[in-house]
Structure formats: C-alpha cells, structure tokens
Amino acid sequence: MDLIHTFLNLIAPPFTFFFLLFFLPPFQIFKFFLSILGTLFSEDVAGKVVVITGASSGIGESLAYEYAKRGACLVLAARRERSLQEVAERARDLGSPDVVVVRADVSKAEDCRKVVDQTMNRFGRLDHLVNNAGIMSVSMLEEVEDITGYRETMDINFWGYVYMTRFAAPYLRNSRGRIVVLSSSSSWMPTPRMSFYNASKAAISQFFETLRVEFGPDIGITLVTPGFIESELTQGKFYNAGERVIDQDMRDVQVSTTPILRVESAARSIVRSAIRGERYVTEPAWFRVTYWWKLFCPEVMEWVFRLMYLASPGEPEKETFGKKVLDYTGVKSLLYPETVQVPEPKND
C-alpha cells in the first residue's frame, strides 16, 4: 500500500500539471461559448415563483426588487414582518404579480418548513430558492467568555440554508429550478475576529458544492461569494454572544480600506448570473483575485491581514492600521456609501 502512495506522490503532481497545461485553454474557450449561450438564452422568470430568505433588508431586499422587475412571484421570509411588508409593497409596485410575506426564523426547522408549505399552498410550484439570511459575529476567539453564545451564527448562516434547501428540494427538482446561495468571500479570507462567520460561510460553500453532484442537472446552483456589500452588516450591525451590537468603529476596523459595493449593483449582477445559469458569481468582480492570493500566497495574505486588522501591542483593539488610514486620510467618504454610515440600521 505504501508503494502505491509513493508512486502516486511522484506521478500525480507532474501529470496534473501537464494535463492542465493542455486541457485548460480549450476548456476555458468552451466555457466562454457556454457563457455566451447563457446570455442569449437567459431564463425568463416572469410568473415563476421565487423564495427569498432574509428579505427584509440589504441584499435580500434588493434581490426581491430585481426579481420583481422581471415579473416573478415572490415569497419573502425574515424575522421582521413590518419591514417585509414594506419590501413587499415596493416589489408589487416594481412589477411582481403576487408577493407573499412569511415571518420566519430560518434557524428553526419548523419555520423553514412553513415557508415552503405556504409557497406550495399559494402557488403550487417553486422555481428559485434564494438562501440569503445571515448574521455576522465579531470577536477574537480568546476574548469569548461563553462560546456557546456563538451557535446562532452557525444556526442561521449554515443550518438555515440546509433546512430551506431540504424542504424545497423536491419541488425545485420538479420544476428543474435553481438555488441561489449567498455565501461570502469570507469563506476563504482569514479576517481576524470573524472566525465564526468565516467558518459558517466556508461550510455552506462546501455543502452546496457537494449538492451540485447530488442534484446533478435537475437543480441548478449559483454560488455567490460577495465582498463587502452595502447592507446592515456594513452599517455595523453585529451579533456577539446572541446580542445585537451596533458598532461602526468596529465596522471600520473589519471593513478597513476595502471599497463597499452598492447593493443595487450587486443584486443586479446576482440575478443576472442566476438566470444565465452561472455556477459562480463574485461581486465586486475584482474580489476574485483574493482567492488566487489565498491559493498561491497564503503567507502573504496572512501577513497583510495581521498588518491591516490587528492593532500593535499595547494599543487599543480598534486602533488598527487600516482604521488609521480611514481616519487620517479621509478616504472613507470615497470607499463607503453614505447609506452605511447611518447611525442605526433598519429595525422593527
């Protein structure tokens, strides 16, 4: 057995290198032509049924408006019913023929089942499931006193997606529908204080990569890995040990000098990619390069993140190099939309 592994250790790397050297160029050309076909023959979602979780604000809200403009029927789910009603009203004005609001906590399996059941009772079909609900926790691991208080991050960011997908899968298979998964570039980026959030996004990315194989061509999956997008998270809304915290100084520490993309632009790109049948979408597009840095130069990425996101010894936690650049140069007004600098995110 050891001899087999020794042989593979010697043969597998050079074989893979030369295989990719000759295979990748024609394969990329093939994918380019597929993308053209996807653009020419995009899915028409008019009259189709789209379920969106976390639709009361941020990316979920803007995704609802984008689907509404295309004439889709919507089922909007979130914990804040009043905000959902406001989103639903605007979605109707934008062109959605029918909008259903369901108050639900996706961390609870029974609530996720309720969302799917009400969808089928109302429309009798389900075409797109947009798994979007999520929260962000921010804390250094060694500063966490009760680590069980961070279970909510995984309950919502991971299990909420699992529950919704499990209950919706039979109906999506019948309609040969699509799942749009709001993961994050944090699934590969080692941002300090975001270990729980990063882990939840890495878990969900791999979960849906596996489901691609299990579902095959019956259910399409578009995996979205955005950078920093205009939302309540980039307004400074965090969850620490189960408690909601509004901390824009910590937001400045965590976002640092990274430009924040306007949510309308991100939502347009996500829906456009979904109806084209694309497997992956990263917004803003330039954020894809961070994956290659992580893949080929992980040591460099770790050094940069320590420099930008961690304070020097003896300095306050929030006095990081990245935040100092924001404070002393005035570039914050160029990098952050005005909407993320409001003192209080939307709340019911």
Curated annotation (Swiss-Prot):
Record's GO cellular component terms: cytosol; lipid droplet; membrane
Topology relative to the membrane: Single-pass type II membrane protein
Record's catalysed reaction(s): an 11beta-hydroxysteroid + NADP(+) = an 11-oxosteroid + NADPH + H(+); an 11beta-hydroxysteroid + NAD(+) = an 11-oxosteroid + NADH + H(+); corticosterone + NADP(+) = 11-dehydrocorticosterone + NADPH + H(+); corticosterone + NAD(+) = 11-dehydrocorticosterone + NADH + H(+)
Enzyme class: oxidoreductase
Annotated GO biological process: steroid metabolic process
Transmembrane residue ranges: 10-30
Keyword Transferase: no
Keyword hit for Membrane: yes
Major localisation: other
Active site: Y197
Stated role: Has dehydrogenase activity against corticosterone (11 beta-hydroxysteroid) and estradiol (17 beta-hydroxysteroid), with higher activity against estradiol. Possesses higher dehydrogenase activity with NADP(+) than NAD(+) regardless of the sterol substrate. May be involved in signal transduction regulated by various sterols.
UniProt cross-references to PANTHER family, sorted A to Z: 11-BETA-HYDROXYSTEROID DEHYDROGENASE 1A-RELATED, RETINOL DEHYDROGENASE-RELATED
Protein name as it appears in the record: 11-beta-hydroxysteroid dehydrogenase A
Organism, as annotated: Sesamum indicum (Oriental sesame)
